[in-house]
Amino acid sequence: MKAFPPERIVCLKEETVETLYLLGEQDRIVGVSGYAVRPKQVRKEKPRVSAFTSADIPKILALSPDLVLAFSDLQAEIASSLIQAGVTVMTYNQRDIAGIMAMIQHLGATVGQEQHALKLVN
């Protein structure tokens, strides 16, 4: 990862967008999935760089992300392309409540908001 905690994050799945906003870390987000709708202002504030299983790789690279957050094997090709381009990619596979809670805690720790993330999941 270029910076820790990461300063420039691209979110390819809407759950990570919403979580970063809930953690008060929305200023770290530099690009989002076209499906991101929560919170409402995200569509006005952040550039859209991907659909669910496709992404504009050159647009993502132009944003100079420290970290890209992806989802599961469904975005494996996108993740692979970004990794080959030298980008750090973190992939989550939250498919149930426990997985969602774990993702929130892990993402909170990644951006230095462990305590806030713990409050969200409790």
Predicted features along the sequence, with ranges:
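N-terminal ligand-binding lobe of clamshell/alpha-beta domains
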Residues: 1-122
